[in-house]
Amino acid sequence: KPVYDLYDRLIESGLTSGQKFTADPLPLDKHVPTSLLEDIVFRKIMYTQQDRYEQQLKKLGITADNAYTCTCYLEQVGNTPKQGDILSWAESSAVVYANSVLGARCNRNSGMLELMGSIAGFVPEFGLLTDEGRKAHWLVEVKCTRRPEAQLLGSAIGMKVMEDVPYVRGLDTWLGTELNDENRAYLKDFGA
């Protein structure tokens, strides 16, 4: 509740994001039918502030009613950063993809901190925003006779390196060097 109260204070002060933004996926989809038990558990107990939150994001500058996505970097969303761009994103897979594939710079912080960054127009400079924070701590060499399954390989690497930065070598054997739709999909599933 304190988060929603803070959002109300920001709105009452007239603050909004300097640019339109997307947000993490919603936990509930109003267009999907639910049972009485689901309504009680999800709408009356777990997500009682959902409508309030959505209205607050509209007032703070969310792009559209359907701007809740974990793939905010896709062309159809209209939020694809360029290499070197500093981002204020909270969705973990989008942060990894932006850093690894697109060459943007972004930390994975809470949605609240990222919204504050969007309103302020800047974010704290630490971690993956710095050259030092982007240096790899692990060298991962992929040596397989066929293209590895993206989610399996990404999960295995992630479980080993945890919060460290890996440098993955060898995927170009199957992906080449062009960032086409097929490679984008593979790297998205890989978690890169």
Predicted segments with their positions:
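Non-transmembrane, aqueous-exposed alpha-helical and coiled segments at domain scale
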Residues: 1-192
